[in-house]
Structure formats: C-alpha cells, structure tokens
C-alpha cells in the first residue's frame, strides 16, 4: 500500500490564514525586518517569498539589502538599529552570509526577543531546557505537520538524520519534549541504514540528495523529508528517495510541497509571537 502523503502546502496555508486572522485583531501590524547581504540567487528567492507571505498576512514587512562588500561592522550596526526600532518585532538575517562575516557573531547580535529564526543562544538554551520561546522555523513546522497528520510522537522511536543547529539539534529537542524516544544520526553513525530502520518517525535533514533509500524505512513508518536538493536537470529532490520510501512508509512528505511551505508559515507565527510578547 502506498504511503499517505502529508500535504505541507495545505497545512501551511491553514496556518498562514490563522496567523493573518490573529494579526488582524491587533491594534498594530507586526513588523518583520529581513536583511539580505549580497546577491546569492537562492537567498533572493527565499527573501522574496518571505516578503510576499508577510505582506499577505498583514504584517509591516521591510527588506533591507546590503551589498556583498558590506563589512561585518556595517551589518552589526544595522542589527543594532533594528533592535532598538519599536516598529520591528522580528529580525531575520538571511543565511548564508558572504565570506568575512561571522554568522555566529551576527546571530548573537540580534535581540533574542526579536530572533524569529530562533537561532540566538538564549533561544537555543530555552528550547533545550524545555521552556521554548522562539523556536527554529523548520523544526517547528515539522511538529505541526505531525500534529496535522494525527501522528503522535509520544512513546515513538524517532530518528533525526542530521545534527545541524538549524534543523537537527532543535528537531531532536522538540521531539524529546513531545515524549518521543529520540536518536540523532549523522555522517559518523555506524550502520546508518539499520538505525533508520528502527525508527517509527524518520526525519531526514542531512542535505544529500536521495540518500535515504526505501530499504532504510521501516514498514509503516512516518518519513519527514526536510532536504531540498537541486538535480543536474534543474529539478528538486529531497534527502529521501521518494518513490522507494513511499512504497514502504505509512506517511511521507513530498519535496517540494512538504516541509518547505511550513518554514515560512512558522516564520510568520514566530513574528506574531514576538510582537505579542513585546507590545
């Protein structure tokens, strides 16, 4: 039997509509400032998508573009200005940054109360301690997809493939908080396929095209594919070999149309949360 497809576009559309409705009840428009340094084509696409989504939700959205030649000091000065701007509730600096700018220094410079990416050490610590405030958008989106699909992590064996600070580590923390039994696997894990086969919930976030094959998936497991990889032909594939995995899994997210739309929807929700907490 083919796996049930978890439609991230539909879940994201519902969340965006909910955020817009909640924002409309406020006496102010939540303010989101997006900073783009340089002219990376993929980053420009992401920023345009975020800007459109924010405006559609009724937010006051501002995109600030700096040249690739901008110094770290210039970027930090801009962040300091945004930190003190009462009309700005959320600040997002689009990654990756040009060479010569330390991304960790930039992340640390953002006011944690406006850190809608959830990357500031204060927000990372709050998540690890079980008292989350602003949570990284992609892991937050994955948890919402699981909930929408009626898949409860409590008591389940969950494996997160990937240990990045952006997805893997916060994903594991959220699953642990939801009472899953969590394993983090990575490039140094022995017998990776066997570890994946033990999982009832398998979340792939490693950035390698179609790395997870069908025989890595336990029959009936839920497979969440966070990866977005461009093929030589210009198409998009995830970290999971979709057709193979879909023949075995109980439920699966597609690429595109799975986790991706949830990331932007959760960015809007984080901005709304930040605005409500500040004003």
From Swiss-Prot:
<dbReference type="GO" id="GO:0004488">
    <property type="term" value="F:methylenetetrahydrofolate dehydrogenase (NADP+) activity"/>
</dbReference>
<dbReference type="GO" id="GO:0006164">
    <property type="term" value="P:purine nucleotide biosynthetic process"/>
</dbReference>
<comment type="function">
    <text>Catalyzes the oxidation of 5,10-methylenetetrahydrofolate to 5,10-methenyltetrahydrofolate and then the hydrolysis of 5,10-methenyltetrahydrofolate to 10-formyltetrahydrofolate.</text>
</comment>
<dbReference type="InterPro" id="IPR020630">
    <property type="entry name" value="THF_DH/CycHdrlase_cat_dom"/>
</dbReference>
<dbReference type="InterPro" id="IPR020631">
    <property type="entry name" value="THF_DH/CycHdrlase_NAD-bd_dom"/>
</dbReference>
<keyword id="KW-0560">Oxidoreductase</keyword>
<comment type="subunit">
    <text>Homodimer.</text>
</comment>
<dbReference type="InterPro" id="IPR000672">
    <property type="entry name" value="THF_DH/CycHdrlase"/>
</dbReference>
<dbReference type="InterPro" id="IPR020867">
    <property type="entry name" value="THF_DH/CycHdrlase_CS"/>
</dbReference>
<dbReference type="InterPro" id="IPR046346">
    <property type="entry name" value="Aminoacid_DH-like_N_sf"/>
</dbReference>
<feature type="binding site">
    <location>
        <position position="228"/>
    </location>
    <ligand>
        <name>NADP(+)</name>
    </ligand>
</feature>
<comment type="similarity">
    <text>Belongs to the tetrahydrofolate dehydrogenase/cyclohydrolase family.</text>
</comment>
<feature type="binding site">
    <location>
        <begin position="162"/>
        <end position="164"/>
    </location>
    <ligand>
        <name>NADP(+)</name>
    </ligand>
</feature>
<keyword id="KW-0378">Hydrolase</keyword>
<dbReference type="Pfam" id="PF00763">
    <property type="entry name" value="THF_DHG_CYH"/>
</dbReference>
<comment type="pathway">
    <text>One-carbon metabolism; tetrahydrofolate interconversion.</text>
</comment>
<keyword id="KW-0658">Purine biosynthesis</keyword>
<dbReference type="GO" id="GO:0009086">
    <property type="term" value="P:methionine biosynthetic process"/>
</dbReference>
<keyword id="KW-0511">Multifunctional enzyme</keyword>
<keyword id="KW-0368">Histidine biosynthesis</keyword>
<dbReference type="GO" id="GO:0000105">
    <property type="term" value="P:L-histidine biosynthetic process"/>
</dbReference>
<keyword id="KW-0554">One-carbon metabolism</keyword>
<dbReference type="GO" id="GO:0035999">
    <property type="term" value="P:tetrahydrofolate interconversion"/>
</dbReference>
<dbReference type="Pfam" id="PF02882">
    <property type="entry name" value="THF_DHG_CYH_C"/>
</dbReference>
<keyword id="KW-0028">Amino-acid biosynthesis</keyword>
<protein>
    <recommendedName>
        <fullName>Bifunctional protein FolD</fullName>
        <ecNumber>1.5.1.5</ecNumber>
        <ecNumber>3.5.4.9</ecNumber>
    </recommendedName>
</protein>
<keyword id="KW-0521">NADP</keyword>
<dbReference type="InterPro" id="IPR036291">
    <property type="entry name" value="NAD(P)-bd_dom_sf"/>
</dbReference>
<keyword id="KW-0486">Methionine biosynthesis</keyword>
<dbReference type="GO" id="GO:0005829">
    <property type="term" value="C:cytosol"/>
</dbReference>
<feature type="binding site">
    <location>
        <position position="187"/>
    </location>
    <ligand>
        <name>NADP(+)</name>
    </ligand>
</feature>
<dbReference type="GO" id="GO:0004477">
    <property type="term" value="F:methenyltetrahydrofolate cyclohydrolase activity"/>
</dbReference>
